[in-house]
Every structure is written in structure tokens, then in C-alpha cells.
Amino acid sequence: MSDYLSVTSLTKYLKMKFDRDPYLERVYLTGQVSNYRRRPSHQYFSLKDEGAVIQATIWAGVFKKIGFDLEEGMKINVVGRVQIYEPSGSYSLIIEKAEPDGIGALALQFEQLRKKLTAEGYFDDRHKQPLPNFVKKIGVITSPSGAVIRDIITTVSRRFPGVEILLFPTKVQGDGAAQEIVENIQKANQREDLDLLIVGRGGGSIEDLWAFNEEIVVQSIFESRLPVISSVGHETDTTLADFVADRRAATPTAAAELATPISKADTLAWIRERQNRAYQACLRRIQYNQERLAKLSQSVVFRQPERLYDGYLQKLDRLTTRLETFMSQDFERKQKSAEFLRQRLHGLNLSTRVKNYQDRRESLQRLLVTTTKNTINGNRVRLEKAQDALLSLDTSRIVARGYAIVNKNDKPLTTIKDITEGEQLTIQMRDGQLEVEVKNVNEKNI
């Protein structure tokens, strides 16, 4: 009986052999993922090829570091150790490292994250913010020692010298780079003096640029209140930061040009154009007013100003006639009424009362006549004043008082600034006009 081993003893012996075998401590395998269903923590599945299958396990801590998602049927290269599980007597592979076969892990991770973020709408054009035409201050998130910041400063200074640049010194590759990029984007968004951000770095391998493919960086750019221009790597390099940014620039110089779409020279040209337009508009307005003034000076109102108030005189005559008629008729009515009352009172032998009413009637009659005369006289005085004011506008009366009107090309002159020596002028006087030539022009304020 002592020659027989128990199942447990055999299993322990085999486990010891597996654990001590140096060839099984670190195994490199290529296989196809099978029976895979993602779990919240540890991952359990099979690796197979055309002739065999082995159970595989990836502990949760390792799975977080491999950087890509496993998929059913995916061919992967793994590094791990073989162990025996004593209760079942089965052996399995404990995977410590894994990467896709035929494609780099970072490339696969990039593609998987790109698909995920695309499905979530991070790269939709409807989320893109427009870049401002004019900026006062630009925030730049990049390394302080690289060529990126020098190219940006040079280009912005050339295109629009007045624009300020605020550098946020940032680690752009290696451990902690993604977190530092996120922190500086958040700092920039807390400032009120920035108009937009440029986020970028120079060229490099996919590993060097990887910080700009991290999901936290993409989310930070997406949530930025400030418009973001991405300039990562060379023209052929593409990162997820480029997809989510409001604009992507192939080079730092191109990013600076996008940040200052209208240069100082363009702005000055635009201002000069607007000034010229305003000047031409003023000239046209002045010419229009001069022509209108010339036409008005030849109108009937200026040549025969008395016609301006002819209608008012006729209306005043009609109103005066109506007033006189009304006063006369009213007086007659009151006189008849008084006579009627006098006769009634006389018939009642109330001589004293009649006498009082007669006195009152005569007093009212005198008051009415006086009021009527005063009203008519007042209206006549106002009419005469209006008539005198209008007559004062008559150029013939002005000339009659000893003044003269100087015309140039049949237009009245109001200033010597419109006269040059040698010009022919016409002087209108009371009894005729003179044709004169200007010999000298002396400016003098009166």
C-alpha cells in the first residue's frame, strides 16, 4: 500500500515541479483569446491554437496596466508563469504582460479609445468653438524649453506685436505628463484674461506623444471654456487631442497663425478702408447739402418771401370778418333782449330797476366794444411783426440797405475759403450787378 500515492500527494508533487522548473517560471506564449467575457476585476479566459487550449488568468492590477481591451478571437502575445491549481489538478497560465500580436499595444489602445470617444460624441463638430478674430492674450501649454514656444512667440510677434503670450510650463511626455497637461488646462480656464489656448509639443514616437492620447486630456480639452488649438507632433502625427480640439494645427507656426487670423497689417488696412468710406460719405453729404442749398436759394420763398405769409393774411382777414360779424350779431341779440326786458320792466312801473339794467347794459356794451377793439389791434400788431420778419428775408430789401450778394457760378458765397485769385465773381447790388475778377484774398474774421 505504501507504493501508492494519493491524488493530493501527486498533485502537490507536480505543483512543486512546476514551481521549481525554471522554464515554467517565465513563459512566452502566442495564442488566440477564447471564452472571454469581461469581468469587473480579475479576467478568466482561454488561450488556444490549432492543437491545444490552456486556461489563463489576468489579475485586476495587471489588467489595468495592459492598456487595451481583450476581444474574443484576438491573437495576443503574453508573458506569464504556469501554475497548478491543486483542488482541481488543472494547470493554468498567470499572465503578467500582454500585447496584441501584429500591432503595438499603444496603437490598439489608441484605436479602441478613439472609437469609444467618437461614440460618446467627443469629436462631433457641433461641440467645436469658433476661434476669435482678435485676441489680446494667448495661453500656451507646452514645454518651456522646446522649439514650440519659440516658434509661437516669433510668429505671433510678427503677425500682431500687441498680443501677449502666457506660457504654462508643462511636462509633455513620460509619467505624470497627462495629469500636468490637465491641471494647466484647468488653471488656464480659471483666468479671465485669456482668449484661447494652444496645447502642443514637438514631434516624437507614439510613446513620446502618448500623453495627448490619454482620456483625461481629451476630456479636459472637451470641457475647456476657452477655444483650444492642438499642435502635437509633426504634420503626419495624429493624437486624440487633435480630434477633440476646436482646431488642429500641423505645426506651432500654423497654430500661431490660427490664433491670430487677422494680422496687424490686415487690421490697419481694414481701418484705412473704413476711414476712406467715411470720408467719401461725408463728401457726398456735403455736396448734396450744397446743391440743396443752391436750389432753395432760387426758390420762390427766397425770391418773393411775401408769398410765404399770403395764406396767413387771407386767413386772418376771414377770421377778423367772422369775429366782427359775430360781435355785431351778438350785440344785436343782447340789445333786443335788453329792449325786451326794458319794455317788460316799464310795463311793471319798475323805473328804478330798469334804470339800473340800462346802466349795466351800457357798461357791458362799452366793455364789449373795447375788448373787441383790443383783440383786433393785438392781432394786427402781431401780423405786422410777422410781416416785417418775413420781409427781412427778402434779398432785394437786404441789397436796398446797402449790402451786396457775391455769387460764384450762380451760387452765393459765404466764405473766402471758396475763392481763389483770378476767379470771376458776380456782385449783385440794388440797381444792377458787377462782374469782377479776384486780385487778392485776405482772410479776416469779423
From Swiss-Prot:
It comes from the Bacteria. It is an enzyme of class 3 (hydrolase). It is found in: Cytoplasm. Its main location: cytoplasm. Keywords: Cytoplasm, Exonuclease, Hydrolase, Nuclease. The keyword Cytoplasm applies. Pfam families: Exonuc_VII_L, tRNA_anti_2. Bidirectionally degrades single-stranded DNA into large acid-insoluble oligonucleotides, which are then degraded further into small acid-soluble oligonucleotides. Belongs to the XseA family. This is Exodeoxyribonuclease 7 large subunit. The gene is xseA.
